[in-house]
Amino acid sequence: MANLKVIGVDPGTRSFDILGMVDGAPLLELSFPSEVVADNPSYIVDKMLEFSPDIIIAPSGYGVPLKRIDELTPKDRFCLTLELEKDKNRIPVLKGLQEMVDILKEKFPETYFIPSVILLPSVPEWRKFNKIDMGTADKLAIGVLAIYMESLRKNISYKDVSFVMVEIGYGYNAALLVKDGRIIDGIGGTLFPGPSFLSIGSMDAELAYLLQNFTKETLFRGGIKDIIGNINDIDEIEKNPHRGKAMLAFKEGILKAIYQLFSIYEPETIILSGRLTRNSFIINDLIDLIKNKTNKEIVILKGFAKKVKEAAQGSAIIGDGILGGKFKDIVDWTLIKEATGNVLSYIKIKNEANFY
């Protein structure tokens, strides 16, 4: 299809990014504070539709098997955000994302939703038991971008690409293991063995039990910001005299995630991506630590766009590939179209798992 126009998005904790591509080349790059999603989701939809796309890859949250918007079931909608009734409307951005889905369903039927890591057939079933978050749909998209960029950088085929990738974001950290060009394991933001800027990462189950009024908002707490206690943004970390132990927990968590994935397979390359990689104080120290501990090649994922974040680029790649464009081969190889099940499929605590 000539002049194939694709929209990919990154529904980040801090910003909502849009990438428009034509025949695989970036043409439109927009970034909005995430508050805009909460306050005016129709404005963002209108901006996407001004591009006259052939396909939009919508914010897919915890993911569903590849589906057009008119194929989504009520359970699929629940699985996008995993909000219980008691938490509805407590987090404005999540409310805005659900409203955006409603608007897209009405205005643009060629909207698609993509899977998260746990739904991929390349991840063995036994790694999925009693897990939900092995990497959200946006983390899968970043992984696809990383596979593509590594194949270019090394001039090799997708099937020869292997790496550990760590996404170091504002809200969450996450890690993926790629072997032979396919994602085979992942550690999502709510399973990560150390804090991100906002989030606690993995939580002691006894602590979860004691937090009787556990809400969705709790998942955005307990990170560097709360450990230090008197900062509001990433750039304030460097000058804060109380940062020391918080940053040790942050860096050790990233090392633990890398070695956790190394226990399955140990590639020679570690890729770092995400908002915090653009903070020189944080990333330079982290690269030195990882190099000294692992003796691996460290690569910062740059992508091919100038402004928007990696997940928007990866989701645009997926959209292009779905329609048989430039990136068809990488979408086919990564088995995105073969994703099955739902993010609750592998919960084995039967008597308790009445989520939906």
Give names to the regions the model predicted.
Residues 46-55, 153-157, 255-270:
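Phosphate/pyrophosphate-binding loops at sites that engage ATP/ADP/AMP, CoA/4′-phosphopantetheine
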Residues 132-159, 170, 180-239:
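Glycine-rich phosphate-binding loop plus the immediately following alpha-helix
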Residues 2-29, 161-185:
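Gly/Thr-rich phosphate-binding beta-strand-loop-beta motif of the actin/hexokinase/Hsp70
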Residues 295-356:
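Glycine-rich phosphate-binding/hydrolytic loop that grips phosphoryl groups
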Residues 52-131:
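Short beta-strand-loop/turn "lid" adjacent to the catalytic site in phosphate-handling enzymes
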Residues 15, 267-289:
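Glycine-rich phosphate-binding loops at beta-strand->alpha-helix junctions
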Residues 217-268:
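Adenine-nucleotide phosphate-binding core of ATP-dependent small-molecule kinases
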